Amino acid sequence: AEGRQNKPDNKSFSNKIKRPMNQIAKAKLSDSAVMRWLALSIVSGTMMFAYFFTDVMSPLESMLSEGLGWDANEYGFFSGAYGLMNVFLLMLFFGGIILDRMGVRFTGLLCCALMIVGASVKWYAVSHIDPNAVVENFHLDLFIIKIDAPHTSNLVAALGFSIFGIGAELAGVTVSKVISKWFTGHELALAMGVQVATARLG
């Protein structure tokens, strides 16, 4: 009976060995300056393109007004759609929960997927939908923006921009966690500064 009680559990013993080995592998990866800065360049580049796509439509207001027939209210609605779901549907709150539960890899892929889908919808709206098509019997009264019978391209572009905004803002939170994970104990403040500076280039 004593022999059975003192017999080691091979399964639990192997698990104990695997855990330290995994921790050592991760520690070595983050200790490599090349890998740290490579990871930083990837996430910084992602945020740079996200900011670029967010702001690229601002100088095109006159072109959108002339080419698509959008008025000032429609353009204002489109511009504000970026943060619409994040503010009113609390998407960043739920995104933070997803990040804590699922980790940076899953959340990072989710952010990229949302940005690609949103950008594709927005591109389709401004390039393929008939500029003369309008949505009849549609009325929107949102704070100072009032829209009656808006252009179809405007509503679809706003939807795409909202989806893109969810991915872009959640990506900002994810990038902060990625940097803190890779650079804690190293050049954390420098990495944060480089990321912000690179992102603002967009």
Residue ranges and their predicted role:
Residues 80-97:
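Central cavity-lining transmembrane alpha-helices of secondary-active solute carriers
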Residues 51, 55, 149, 153, ...:
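Small-residue-rich segments within alpha-helical transmembrane domains of MFS-like 12-TM solute carriers
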Residues 38-72:
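Extracytoplasmic
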Residues 17-46, 50:
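Cytosolic juxtamembrane N-terminal segment immediately preceding the first transmembrane helix
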Residues 113-149:
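C-terminal ends and interior cores of transmembrane alpha-helices
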